[in-house]
Amino acid sequence: MLHSLFRLTLLFYALFNALGSLPVFIALLKNFSFKKQQHIILRESIFALLLLLLFVTFGRGFFRLLGIILPAFQFTGSLLLGSIAIDMMKALPPQTETLERDKDEPIFFPLAFPVITGPAMITSTLGHMEEGIFPKKIVLGAIVLAWLFSLITLLLSSSINRLFGQMGLLALERLFGISLALMAGNLMLKALSTAFNIGYYVTP
């Protein structure tokens, strides 16, 4: 159980991509005081968690009503994960030029969604809840733990940026990208195995 919790927490933390989002937060919040920055990060992180829990709690029934099946979640999730992984492995810097021009305080968009909780995160958590390999309490626990670690990362953004520097952050992001790419491949194999009933077993 602890091993499953660790694996899911690592996956969800990579999907929150707090390290990769640091430049966006720094650019958006640089005109605010340190205390105000911490307040905004905490508020937007709470918004992001509530949004994710809302999808996890009620999203499954809604998508079932639309006739969307588990392999669709898995396949779409693998594509989204793969896309994020490619960007992370290339260590593409976020587009912050437009953000830097905006002096207004960001509320919900774009920090809570889609920077912290994005489509890939929503799809992945829904997929894990739907497939039932992991107990729901493990999935929910992993979501909260990953969110907490991401929040700590964002709150320490200034210190982390000074400690690792731009090159260090890019190296860490590439490392997470490689792990995420492997997870995406595993998820796609699961989707194909389920959809075509080819009998290929992929460990959860």
Swiss-Prot record:
Membrane topology of the entry: Multi-pass membrane protein
Domain of life (superkingdom): Bacteria
Matching Pfam families: MarC
Subcellular location: Cell membrane
UniProt entry keywords in alphabetical sequence: Cell membrane, Membrane, Transmembrane, Transmembrane helix
InterPro entries recorded: Multi_antbiot-R_MarC (IPR002771)
GO cellular component: plasma membrane
Coiled-coil annotated residue ranges, if any: none
TM annotation in the entry: 9-29, 39-59, 66-86, 107-127, 138-158, 176-196
Keyword Transmembrane helix: yes
Family: Belongs to the UPF0056 (MarC) family.
Protein name (database record): UPF0056 membrane protein CT_852
Organism: Chlamydia trachomatis serovar D (strain ATCC VR-885 / DSM 19411 / UW-3/Cx)
